[in-house]
């Protein structure tokens, strides 16, 4: 009997939102996206101790002005190390996130994105396998516009509205990630109404974005995320 996952794959690309390499090997998604919290959760497991130890040893061989600089370096390199492993087991894209602390700084976001891409390329992973995940703030969207113009594909994340989505598409974002579950969470917390699969406001928001993009011929991919 065909599984729900296999049925879904017939109609849509499936993207894994995890740092667990074993789970990705098990479920064989098309693409994969990670974030710092998922990477942090993954490195708590002894399964990835070798990967963590290699990144830590590399950081100790470098000089840093401040401890925070070393911590930031380790976080970036861990995300890239996991990303490199993921490119070996999935056929499509791996999304790697720019530090959310930079979400309101266009210049710093662009600089960090280029550092991430350079690290991947130095490790033999071509940039066409990587999406740089950037928060859909105004500053983040301006960074995406610049990066896309320079051939660096971006995943515009933390999308909660049609206005945000259109701004990302106008900037040329390769892909956007509307957060279905978090939209539903907000409505549940701020309304006495009952919600189910037939009236989920998160799903309705993604449907509106998808239909708008189709109507006005935007090429930006809509990747619904954060399902509950």
Locate each region found by the language model:
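Active-site beta-loop-alpha junctions enriched in small/polar residues
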Residues: 19-21, 37, 99-103, 135-137, ...
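Glycine-enriched alpha-helix->loop->beta-strand junction motifs that scaffold or abut catalytic
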Residues: 28-31, 143-154, 170-176
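Catalytic alpha/beta core domains of metabolic enzymes, predominantly
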Residues: 155, 160-228
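Structural preference for beta-strand elements that scaffold enzyme active sites
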Residues: 13-15, 31-33, 93-95, 129-133, ...
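Alpha-helix-loop-beta-strand connector modules within alpha/beta enzyme cores
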Residues: 82, 87-88, 118, 141-150, ...
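N- or domain-start disorder-to-order transition segments that initiate the globular core
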Residues: 1-19
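Conserved, mostly hydrophobic/aromatic
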Residues: 35, 96, 132, 147, ...
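Active-site beta->alpha loop and helix N-cap motifs at the rims of alpha/beta catalytic domains
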Residues: 38-41, 46-137
